[in-house]
Amino acid sequence: MRDGEQTPGVALTKEKKLLIARALDEMKINVIEAGSAITSAGERESVRAVANAGLSAEICSYCRIVKTDVDHALECDVDSIHLVVPVSDLHIRTKIKKDRDTVRQIAADVTEYAKEHGLIVELSGEDSSRADLGFLKAVYSDGIDAGADRLCFCDTVGLLVPEKTTEIFRDLSSSLKAPISIHCHNDFGLATANTVAALAAGAKQAHVTINGLGERAGNASLEEVVMCLEWLYKYDTGIKHEQIYRTSRLVSRLTGIPVSPNKALVGGNAFTHEAGIHVHGLLADKATYEPMSPEYIGRQRQIVLGKHAGRSSITLALKEMGLEADDAQTEEIFNRVKQMGDQGKHVTDADLQIIAETVLDIYKEPLVKLEEFTIVSGNRVTPTASIKLNVKDKEIVQAGIGNGPVDAVINAIRRAVSSCAEDVILEEYHVDAVTGGTDALVEVRVKLSKEGKSITASGARTDIIMASVEAVMNGLNRLVRAE
């Protein structure tokens, strides 16, 4: 968690850290590095809160080779410290301006000090991949003699390659008398590969972050490393893998860092299919175009429609909507979807519903209808929205506040439909200006989910608030009708 929070722009409050720590603990993560106690009084309060939350995981604080860092960690009631020692000549000369012998002595002294105060110590070589291996081993050996429980090799700027990683870890794991961890950064996109290579060569622990968050290009991704081990190496990690996606979404929401659509396993497109030939294959056997079952990590596959969609995609989507179409009707729906795709339009579930109902000559009265809404916003006013909806022929009036007018009106809608759509989650919100100018047509696309079922919907108006309301209302009606 500490390295993930070092992602530029991320700052977690105590409450957010507790939410993430509890989610990690539920996943059966062994060690949670809750923060760096030396950072500030506020950080110490957060780390202490995590340490005293009654979690099963070992709670750890980052420390430099400075005794006051250890003292601050002790104030936070942590179980262990991640004691980081600069080991490359570059870091020793330029960062701490000392020599090798002095660094060895200080590292051993601080390790001994921490052990005397009852802490578990993981002694970590910062910039290990650019260090002299003989010197690194000497630092590790001194640490073991001083009582270090674990060691860690840090590829601080992501310079390792898997072949070199394997060579190094075979050497270290066979020559050192303490378990060794691997800590990889993703500067060249090799963090997961290097982490798995180290584990295969004898490393006993891996440092990872949810969604691969971290400084610069991030760290090794927890979900990628765990699933490589579980699915490719058939190794039981003990992690509750079915909670991976839910935890990924939680971390993304709390940090404000969106997950790239093509991110392995947890990205929006990881189990999403559009191309007709792929969907046709999936209908015959899901293994044709999926390396693993999405349910294994708590996900569902999704078929999306657009210019690459095939008839199989249309048939499957209609079936999921509970609609029956003959061959001629299916062909007409298929052609209309293709036409929208060729125009560059993103075809949402709600779009398909409208197309299908038009072709099939079906009209279904919306179960949730907008009667009216009002927004109050300004530079000295908390954005507030009041809304009147007709929900299954019952008039409901509600209000909501938010970080802006769009947030406020969506919160008001949530409250108004709580009786029939209590667990609806707004997973994604995307805005595009379709035309130019201050009176541009705005298209809003949303992704809503309820009890594992996800749908997409859109709204297009010159008013972004109206477009947002239209998109959410279209999505809500699809979800409510699906029940």
From Swiss-Prot:
It is an enzyme of class 2 (transferase). Pathway: Amino-acid biosynthesis; L-isoleucine biosynthesis; 2-oxobutanoate from pyruvate: step 1/3. It catalyses: pyruvate + acetyl-CoA + H2O = (3R)-citramalate + CoA + H(+). It comes from Methanosarcina mazei (strain ATCC BAA-159 / DSM 3647 / Goe1 / Go1 / JCM 11833 / OCM 88). InterPro entries: 2-isopropylmalate_synth_dimer, AIPM/Hcit_synth_CS, Aldolase_TIM, Citramalate_synthase_CimA, LEU1_arch, LeuA/HCS_post-cat, LeuA_allosteric_dom_sf, PYR_CT. Belongs to the alpha-IPM synthase/homocitrate synthase family. SMART domains: LeuA_dimer (SM00917). GO terms for molecular function: (R)-citramalate synthase activity; 2-isopropylmalate synthase activity. Homodimer. This is Putative (R)-citramalate synthase CimA. GO terms for biological process: isoleucine biosynthetic process; L-leucine biosynthetic process. Keywords: Amino-acid biosynthesis, Branched-chain amino acid biosynthesis, Isoleucine biosynthesis, Transferase. Its EC number is 2.3.3.21.
